[in-house]
Amino acid sequence: MANYTAADVKKLRELTGSGMLDCKKALEESAGDFDKAVEILRVKGAKDVGKRAERNATEGLVAVSGNTMIEVNSETDFVAKNSEFKEFAANVADAAAAAKANSQEELAAVDVDGKTADAALQEFSAKIGEKLELRRAVTLEGDKTAVYLHQRSADLPPAVGVLVAFTGEGEAAEAAARQAAMQIAALKASYLTREDVPAEIIEKERSIAEQITREEGKPEQAIPKIVEGRLNGFYKENVLLEQSSVADSKKTVKALLDEAGVTVTSFARFEVGQA
């Protein structure tokens, strides 16, 4: 006959966050000693950390606080949509914003209720039994930011997040900046202007364009012009200000921003599980 009750199991689950089966086993092992059962579960959680470290965390969410955006990963979408996980991520995002965290290392070191975010993460990981990761953080400079968070389905937290730092006044400016954030989420611009594209990337694209053009048998004298045209195509696909706007395909993003008196100074895009 068990020397513990269903109420003991419930209380132990609420206190430790462990599963029902683990709580029952701990109470059996402790012969109903509640405090010892708590200790058993804490030891089990610590041992499980090593096992969890070998698993992949490719689900999760993107959270934003002020000018700061973070990505926190979990193993399953079941945990990603858990209210405790979302609350944990929100608290870390607030701490990251206060510290202006701008890298994974800085994110892991921010203070969350008197402990580092990494330490808080490990405790929470032991509680829920899944590998969790503080993936990355970015903080944009500027007084104004537009935010767009995209959910892949209504029951899941945001999996894509975009922050846009901008200057401009009024509702029209704010709407245009948010539209730019939505554009970045959808079309995945990598650069703000063509001047931001690294020289080695340009040379690589130029080389590929020239190789393709030659293989097509184009006249030698026409090759430079065709290559430049293809390079411009690369810019229009990858440079935000040169993309055709999803809101008005007849205009570039730059044209619509100019109409609203907006200057985008920087942006960042996170997608859960992606580089």
From Swiss-Prot:
Keywords, comma-separated and alphabetical: Cytoplasm, Elongation factor, Protein biosynthesis
An annotated Gene Ontology molecular function: translation elongation factor activity
Region (Involved in Mg(2+) ion dislocation from EF-Tu), start-end ranges: 76-79
InterPro entries hit by this protein: EF-Ts_dimer_sf, Transl_elong_EFTs/EF1B, Transl_elong_EFTs/EF1B_dimer, Transl_elong_Ts_CS, UBA-like_sf
Main localization, broad class: cytoplasm
Top-level taxon in the UniProt lineage: Bacteria
A cellular component term, taken from the record's GO annotations: cytoplasm
Cellular localisation: Cytoplasm
Entry function: Associates with the EF-Tu.GDP complex and induces the exchange of GDP to GTP. It remains bound to the aminoacyl-tRNA.EF-Tu.GTP complex up to the GTP hydrolysis stage on the ribosome.
Family of this protein: Belongs to the EF-Ts family.
Protein known as: Elongation factor Ts
Organism expressing this protein natively: Corynebacterium glutamicum (strain R)
